[in-house]
Design a protein with these regions (language model features):
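Pocket-lining segment of extracytoplasmic ligand-binding domains
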Residues: 196-287
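Short, glycine-/small- and polar/acidic-enriched structural segments
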Residues: 50-194, 198-204, 208-214, 227-237
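Bacterial N-terminal signal peptides
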Residues: 28-43
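Secondary-structure end/capping motifs
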Residues: 251-332
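Conserved C-terminal helix/tail region of periplasmic/extracytoplasmic solute-binding proteins
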Residues: 321-359
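N-terminal export leaders
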Residues: 19-20, 36
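Sec/Tat signal peptide C-region and signal peptidase I cleavage site
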Residues: 44-48
Length: 359
């Protein structure tokens, strides 16, 4: 862990000094890893012979929200184990740390927003690839003080997001632009770390609003805040909850990655079909949530937005590239296919195995 911690320190210094000044205020600022990672992490990338034979995986998830329930279910219901995998789940909030851990070999697969994977790739980490997407839209709500009712009233206000470059940050900026507001000039955006911190900031009067995914939005609603808009209802196709790895890892351990995809797909089915078991697991991870909040979180994530097969989509990646064009000129010429490997989901789907689960 010493090497990883040392790298994170270097990464923080890099982003704080030159790189943040380059794209100040823009949502992809956390991923100025570029060529640094390609050279610095080469010594960590090689898997030992023992690792290559092992089915042990370290997999991260980026938030405590219903969006991560599929992964929790795969672990807690023994689905990973049933598919021959020994999985450690690690909570790592924020794209930079999980991406650094992936490229250093500390993690083999990461759960993250698609924007983190695409940004890392454009900045030089060309080996990263998106292999599955469980939510291909923005399942977030903008929650505000109750007296804010018109987009024009948002000008000059302060909003909380989990981090600059996070999905909550992207959602806020997307909404503001749709209302002809400039996210860098017309409002103040504060990275708060997590949804509980955003809610605390709103309660303390430090924030006028914040972006939440369920159940955070429901907790805010219960405290008297207003759902200004449900971003999911806008039908924006966007690779939001994704799983990524490296092409090298797929090449060296394709069968293992295939077992992960199969486990994920079984967990999706179990999430949809076993409500009592799913709620019990969600309660374990989403602490202090009452039953009504859990029920609504389940409805949104298991029944409303979750597909049967976790296909990454080119349109979902295209939306990310479009949003990056102003800060990363390379995004304009990039093709979505360069960031995605659909082959593992396709192989499982074409075998008829997914359809048979739902019969």
């Amino acid at each position: 862990m010493f090497v990883f911690d040392t790298y994170l320190l270097s990464f923080r210094l890099l982003t704080r000094r030159s790189w943040l000044s380059r794209i100040q205020g823009h949502f992809c600022c956390f991923l100025g890893i570029g060529v640094v990672l390609n050279g610095l992490l080469i010594s960590f990338g090689a898997l030992s012979a023992q690792d290559k034979k092992s089915n042990k995986l370290a997999i991260s998830y980026p938030s405590i929200s219903g969006a991560q329930a599929v992964l929790w279910i795969a672990k807690e219901m023994g689905i990973f184990r049933d598919n021959g995998l020994d999985v450690d789940l690690v909570y790592i909030g924020g794209g930079p740390r999980s991406m650094a851990a992936l490229l250093s070999g500390q993690l083999q697969i990461i759960g993250t927003g698609g924007n983190a994977l695409v940004s890392a790739n454009l900045n030089g980490a060309k080996d990263t690839v998106l292999i599955a997407t469980t939510y291909n839209t923005l399942v977030f709500s903008l929650m505000t003080r109750a007296n804010l009712k018109d987009p024009k009233e948002l000008k000059g206000k302060t909003f909380g997001v989990t981090g600059i470059g996070s999905l909550s940050d992207f959602t806020l900026r997307t909404l503001l632009r749709r209302w002809s507001l400039d996210p860098t000039r017309d409002v103040v955006v504060r990275p708060m770390g997590g949804y509980p911190e955003i809610l605390s900031g709103m309660q303390a009067g430090q924030l006028d609003g914040g972006v939440f995914s369920p159940p955070g939005n429901l907790n805010a609603l219960a405290l008297g805040f207003r759902e200004f808009i449900d971003a999911g209802s806008m039908g924006i196709e966007y690779a939001s909850t994704c799983y990524g790895t490296t092409r090298r890892f797929i090449h060296e351990r394709r069968e293992t990655v295939g077992q992960f995809i199969k486990s994920l797909t079984v967990a999706i089915h179990r999430f949809k079909s076993d409500k009592p078991g799913s709620l019990k697991i969600m309660q374990r991870y989403i602490k202090n949530a009452d039953q009504k909040v859990l029920e609504e979180t389940y409805r949104v994530y298991a029944l409303q937005y979750l597909p049967r097969a976790p296909y990454p989509t080119h349109n979902g990646v295209r939306a990310i590239l479009d949003s990056l064009e102003t800060v990363l000129p390379e995004a304009k010429k990039a093709e979505p296919a360069a960031f995605v490997d659909m082959s593992l989901v396709q192989e499982l789907d074409k075998s008829g195995w997914i359809d048979r689960m739902y019969r």
